[in-house]
Each structure stands twice: as structure tokens, then as C-alpha cells.
């Protein structure tokens, strides 16, 4: 009996050993195949001038592909994976930004003898048209109720936009000058408004060389000195208009060309004075509702006449407004690749962890969070939170380490949901066209692109697993998930060709 049992055990052991050898051989063969795919990609003529870094690992840590994984490359918007991830990890998915309404001075017979302050707390979606944000008229109506509840029927001072939540400049010094006037180059401020944009309607002139017709649309910034220098370009030249402005003077010049065959369209540019814009719009709202503001609107940067009447050192809070939760902000950040939101999360890390939202403090805070995540900062040299700076440098190895640490965190489900699916809504809508849904929908990735740069990093979920909102992801699924990063720099080939080749590589990796 015992001999027979031992004989069966030996047979079982031999079978198990044989299976393990087969599985090991298969796994090795797959890794070898993936490595060949990666080498083929690097040797493609499309990337003849490019630097390429690739790494892919399983959730258990097994390396599947590794090519130049330690080379540090410009990540472009792949930086948003880091800013949204560290914010979710450090601040929590339920974190909200708070804007408060306050006044100084005193109230007598319905008159506020002082100033009314809109004290910004870094809410990047105040006044945004996005459906995730509270509609501006609702915010203003609530603030109006707060003003009336405080017994204020008239304001002898000014309505002041207070953006001092932000220390230092709102833009990163290494951003390119040509980006600063664009909607995607809008800098952070303590009090933001309409995502720090201003919109114009643009239409071509009657002939090539004629002035472009351009008018402010929203918000109406009447205090700005706009210099419209754009001209009508040849057919097929598209929109090549750029706005050049700075936060030091309310002057903006729009230069470039707008194609003769283009129809009337809306163009979004950056607003360097969102604090004052918000104050003006709320002041106008109050006056429409019968609450006079004797000294108009002001801020701490553009219009400071009001400071003769008050110092804002001691104020009484009479109302507040909260942003959407961070989880939803992260979703919008990664799906739209929204630079302003990413920069805000980066600065919030500094504010909450060091007490300062300046760039240097935010960098120190982010490195501290990475240390808590046991990721470290080797393979990372950052300048901002959005990836707009070309001086950001990240290795594929660091990106995989970071994504692996996020998988082990308590906020992984929220983080994963924030990442777009190829072919779906967001910045990946043109990726993986024609790829079957059961393959395509397993990907949760973030793209990064600028001139000469194309990067993709994220997760490939196991086949047969359906991701459900709010459901915990089993460890077995995490172990079988592929974590990857593909980064290309200095590539002069066409965008569509690069995207097509990288799509094929990612699909092969997913198989």
C-alpha cells in the first residue's frame, strides 16, 4: 500500500516536473519572441534617427521585454501618469480643492465697509464648461446667497480675486515661449477660471494676405490689449495662429496665418489673469442682482488699487465651494491629457506635503511620495507635472517601476479607471483602429507626444477579465497583468506611421 502510494507520488512528481519544464520553455520562448519584436521595432527604418526605450514586465515582476530600458528620454504627456498617480496615492481619491468667499472690514446697515474676497484654493475646474464641474451660474448664485446671508447689500470696497494659494510663477521656466499663449500652455494659478483660457472666434479674410477676422468670445477680457496681426494663408495651410503673452502685462499679440479655406472656428488661448477675470465676472453678477460694488474688481497681480482700502490680512469666511473629487480630476487629466490639471495636482502635492506650492517644493514633495511608494527617483528627472517641458527625462524602467507600485497601492482601481482605452474617448481615439474589441479593451494606457516624441505606457489586463467600476481587482489578475512602457524620441517620421507601428507592437505584447 505504501509502496503503491509512493509510486503514484513519483509519477505525479515526474508529470509536474515535465509540465514545469514545458511551461518554462514556453515562457522563455515567448520572452524571446517579444524581445525579437522589440528589436525589429528598433531597427525599423521609421526609427532610424530615433532613440527608443522599451520595457515590459508582468505584475509578478517577470521581465518580458527590455531594450534601452535605462535610457532617459523625454516622456511628453506620459508625465501625467506620475502626477496623477502620486496625487491619488498621497492626497487620496476623495481629495477636493476649496475656494472660499470672505470679507474684511465691517458690515453696517447692509453696507460692507471693506472688500469681498474670492480666495482661491487651487480648484482647476472653477468656471469650467466641463460637465464634471459645477456650472458657473450655480456657483455664483450660491455665493450671492452667502453674501446676502451675511447681511451685505452693498460693497464699498472691491471684489478681489485672491490667487495667493500658488507661490511662485504659474508656468515652468523651461516651457517654450511659443507654448505659453496656447490653451495647453495655460499656467496654474491659485484662483483659476474657465481652465485659465480665453476663447476667440476666427475666420479668414477675403483673400490671401488679408487680415484674419478675430474677435474675443469668452470670457470678455476688456482690460487686455489685443494686437491681432494674423493674416490669411494659402488654402490647405490650416490654423497656424499663435498668441504671445506674459503674466507681467495685459498685452497679447496674435501672429501667424489662418488658411483661406478654413471656416469660422473657435480658438482657445491662455488667460494670464484668471484671478482678475473671476473677480470681474462675479462683480458683474452681483451688480446684475442689485448688489453694488463701489470700487469694482481687483486682484493681487493686475489691478491693485483696492489695496489702499484693505490688506486682506484678516478676513471672515462667509461661503465656500468645493471642486470635484480628485478621482474625477485624474480621469479628465489622463483622458484629455490636460496640462493645467496635471500641473495643479503637481503643485497640490507641494502645498499639502511641504506647505508651499512653488515648483521646487512640489518637486521635493513628489520625490518624497516616490520614496513612500518604494519606487525611488533613479531614472527620473522632472521639470513639471504635465510633460510640456522638453527637459523632463524618464526611463522606461522607472515608468514600469512606478506603474507596478501603483498596482500595489490602495488607489489602483481609481488610477486604472483614469487611463484611456485605445479607440475610445480621449487622446487614444485613433489608436488600434480595426483591432478586435476583446483585445483593444484590455489596454489602459497613457500616450505622450510632441514634435519628435511618441510614448505609450500603461497596463494590459489578462484576456477574459472584465474590469468593473468599483470592484476590487483580484491579486491573480494583477499578477497576470502586463506593465509596459514604450518611448521614442528624435523620430522624424510621420505621426500616423509611428502610431501604426507602435500599435502593432503593443497588440503583439497583449497577445
Regions found by a protein language model. Name each.
Residues 1-33:
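Bacterial Sec-dependent N-terminal signal peptides
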Residues 30-60, 65-71, 145-151:
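Beta-lactamase-like hydrolase cores
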Residues 40-41, 90-377, 464-469, 478, ...:
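Conserved serine DD-peptidase/penicillin-binding transpeptidase domain
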Residues 54-56, 99-101, 457:
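Short beta-strand scaffold segments in enzyme catalytic cores
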Residues 61, 80-87, 159, 191, ...:
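Residue-level preference for non-acidic, small/hydrophobic
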Residues 64-66, 336, 343-511:
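Small-residue-rich helix-loop
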Residues 66-86, 90:
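Short active-site loop at a secondary-structure junction
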Residues 68-73, 268, 386-389:
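A short glycine/serine-rich beta->alpha loop
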Amino acid at each position: 500500500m505504501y509502496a503503491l502510494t509512493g509510486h503514484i507520488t513519483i509519477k505525479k512528481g515526474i508529470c509536474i516536473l515535465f509540465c514545469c519544464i514545458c511551461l518554462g520553455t514556453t515562457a522563455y520562448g515567448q520572452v524571446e519572441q517579444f524581445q525579437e519584436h522589440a528589436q525589429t521595432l528598433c531597427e525599423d527604418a521609421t526609427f532610424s534617427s530615433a532613440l527608443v526605450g522599451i520595457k515590459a514586465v508582468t505584475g509578478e515582476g517577470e521581465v518580458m521585454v527590455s531594450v534601452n530600458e535605462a535610457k532617459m528620454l523625454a516622456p511628453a504627456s506620459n508625465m501625467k501618469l506620475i502626477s496623477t498617480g502620486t496625487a491619488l496615492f498621497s492626497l487620496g481619491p476623495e481629495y477636493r480643492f476649496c475656494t472660499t468667499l470672505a470679507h474684511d472690514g465691517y458690515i453696517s446697515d447692509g453696507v460692507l465697509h471693506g472688500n469681498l474676497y474670492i480666495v482661491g484654493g487651487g480648484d482647476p475646474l472653477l468656471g469650467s464648461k466641463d460637465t464634471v464641474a459645477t456650472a458657473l451660474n450655480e456657483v455664483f448664485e450660491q455665493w450671492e446667497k452667502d453674501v446676502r446671508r451675511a447681511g451685505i447689500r452693498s460693497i464699498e470696497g472691491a471684489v478681489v480675486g485672491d490667487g495667493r494659494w500658488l507661490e511662485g510663477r504659474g508656468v515652468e521656466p523651461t516651457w517654450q515661449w511659443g507654448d505659453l499663449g496656447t490653451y495647453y500652455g495655460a499656467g496654474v494659478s491659485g484662483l483659476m477660471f474657465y481652465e485659465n483660457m480665453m476663447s476667440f472666434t476666427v475666420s479668414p479674410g477675403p483673400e490671401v494676405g488679408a487680415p484674419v477676422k478675430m474677435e474675443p468670445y469668452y470670457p470678455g477680457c476688456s482690460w487686455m490689449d489685443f494686437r491681432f496681426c494674423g493674416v490669411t494663408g494659402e488654402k490647405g495651410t490650416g490654423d497656424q495662429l499663435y498668441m504671445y503673452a506674459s503674466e507681467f502685462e495685459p498685452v497679447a499679440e496674435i501672429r501667424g496665418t489662418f488658411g483661406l479655406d478654413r471656416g469660422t472656428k473657435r480658438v482657445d488661448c491662455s488667460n494670464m489673469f484668471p484671478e482678475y477675470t473671476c473677480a470681474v465676472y462675479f462683480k458683474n453678477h452681483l451688480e446684475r442682482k442689485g448688489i453694488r460694488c463701489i470700487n469694482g474688481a481687483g486682484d493681487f497681480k493686475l489691478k491693485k488699487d483696492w489695496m489702499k482700502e484693505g490688506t486682506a490680512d484678516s478676513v471672515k469666511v462667509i461661503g465656500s465651494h468645493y471642486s470635484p473629487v480628485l478621482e474625477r480630476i485624474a480621469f479628465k487629466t489622463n483622458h484629455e491629457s490636460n496640462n493645467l490639471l496635471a500641473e495643479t495636482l503637481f503643485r497640490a502635492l507641494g502645498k499639502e506635503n511641504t506647505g508651499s506650492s512653488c515648483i521646487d517644493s512640489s518637486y521635493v514633495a513628489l520625490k518624497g511620495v516616490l520614496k513612500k511608494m518604494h519606487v525611488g527617483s533613479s531614472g527620473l528627472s522632472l521639470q513639471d507635472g504635465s510633460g510640456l517641458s522638453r527637459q523632463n527625462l524618464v526611463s522606461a524602467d522607472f515608468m514600469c517601476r512606478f506603474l507596478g507600485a501603483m498596482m500595489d497601492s490602495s488607489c489602483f482601481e481609481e488610477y486604472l479607471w483614469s487611463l484611456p482605452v485605445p479607440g475610445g474617448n480621449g487622446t487614444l481615439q485613433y489608436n488600434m483602429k480595426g483591432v478586435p474589441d476583446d483585445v483593444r479593451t484590455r489596454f489602459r494606457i497613457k500616450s505622450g507626444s510632441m514634435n519628435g516624441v511618441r510614448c505609450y505606457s500603461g497596463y494590459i489586463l489578462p484576456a477574459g477579465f472584465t474590469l468593473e467600476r468599483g470592484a476590487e481587482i483580484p491579486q491573480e489578475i494583477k499578477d497576470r497583468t502586463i506593465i509596459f512602457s514604450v518611448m521614442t524620441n528624435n523620430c522624424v517620421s510621420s505621426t500616423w506611421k509611428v502610431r501604426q507601428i507602435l500599435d502593432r507592437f503593443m497588440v503583439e505584447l497583449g497577445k
